[in-house]
Amino acid sequence: MKLRFIGADHEVTGSCHLIEACGKNILVDCGMEQGPDYYENAEIPVALGEIEFVLLTHAHIDHSGNLPAIYAKGFRGPVYATDATSHLCDIMLRDSAHIQMFEAEWRNRKGRRQGKPEFVPAYTMEDAMGVIRNFVGCPYNKMITPAEGISARFIDAGHLLGSASIELTIREEDTEKKIVFSGDIGNTCQPLIKDPEYLHHADYIVMESTYGDRSHGEKPDYVKLLSEIIQETFDRGGNLVIPSFAVGRTQEMLYFIRQIKADGLVYGHDGFKVYVDSPLANEATTIFSEHQYDCFDEEAMELIQKGINPISFPGLKISVTSDDSKSINYDEEPKVIISASGMCDAGRIKHHLKHNLWNEKNTILFVGYQAVGTLGRALIEGAADVKLFGEPVHVAAHICQMPGISGHADVNGLLDWAKAFEEKPQKVFVTHGDDTVTEIFAKRLTDELGYDTMAPFSGTVYDLADNVCLYEAKGVKIQKASASPKATRAARAFEKLLALGYRLITVIRKNEGTPNKDLERFSRDVQSLCDKWDRTDM
């Protein structure tokens, strides 16, 4: 009964954990790394066709985005997730595949001119569609038994529509252990979706720590703040452009704007138009509406019971085609434009920035995190000029940020979630946080709650039956392109060899009870291998 850490260890993205139990290989999350990448990830040490099934906490690409990649390499098992997560992954994994293929086409077009070898995308649309067909939707709080000796339950994590913490119970012979994977724990009092649900019993916890070193501070009145920004912008005769993540944040903005319109908080601009210009956001908004009864909070359900759609209103315009998108910029009336991507590095938002950044009447409002190196980050840090489509654009528009808006719990929310366990777990593994943040939050859990904690690096292997670390990996820093990659390759090769060693132990245990003559032949093979490579005399 082993837990192996693969991704989002001392890093925020690329969540992936491997459970080896009951003769099965199980993945919990299979995410794609996004943004800065500081450490090498250990490879999954089994053939991907030998993965029995995947348990998925939620649809964000840093948790789900590599599912098509493992499908491309042989995985054909079911992916268990909540119903809403299954539906969101249908659109998000197809969108991710489109991006992979578009990037590969662009790089190959450029590379051919330079004589470079062909760039192969991580996966194709066929791979995405293949794994999407294998999703199995599960209701919240219903126990499922995907394999003998293994049961699981999805509990609302309050982070995104359909997001979940996963309670995994494993029974091997006379040993039973309960492992809770927190997933991404949501912020309280988010619009539309419910607050995180607490769990109370676990032998082991694998816990995120995204904001494990900071507080969001006091939450502003978002409706009041947004209405004031709209009022000031429209009074200048300008447009309000909101770069927004297509899934989650866009629907929150629609929720706020519906209330602003219903309460008449913007004066002199009755019936103002709101354009949502993102095909992915439009599909996601439909899915939100389809899952209102299992995912929406009390306030949203009160509106629905009154016959009010909490994320729709008069004046809402949906752009589907590229012609729809282009026509927005011919509308001379003051308006709100919500478009992806949220960090302004891709998508239709770049066209809207080109048409609106130069005009001092307009406002660009950021409602989400802007990573270092993105166009969005440059704008909030005061760039006077930026490049769009290879052309310089002067920044004259007002640049604003909506503070404190986050789908992640802050350090206090994380501690509240951890405090809910009625008995101390045997171990808490702190993951999904920046390098030092994981260590800081692990120490707080120890100092304030008395928990035995560990912030593992990728490649760490833990025996859950005996509560002992079998192998504690060291973080292997990714070398910059200008540096020699020799040391990195050596470290990666050793980690791979070590992982195969642990796999060999698993294979040996599987052969218990086989005929003696087969065991003797197996022993000779292993002995020969050890004799060949034993370096103790060198």
For each feature predicted by the language model, list its residue ranges.
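Charged, amphipathic alpha-helical linkers/stalks
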Residues: 459-518
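Short, surface-exposed amphipathic charged segments that create phosphate/polyanion-binding patches used
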Residues: 150-154, 287-295, 415-416, 465-477
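His/Asp/Glu-rich metal-coordinating catalytic cores
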Residues: 1-55, 60, 64, 71-252, ...
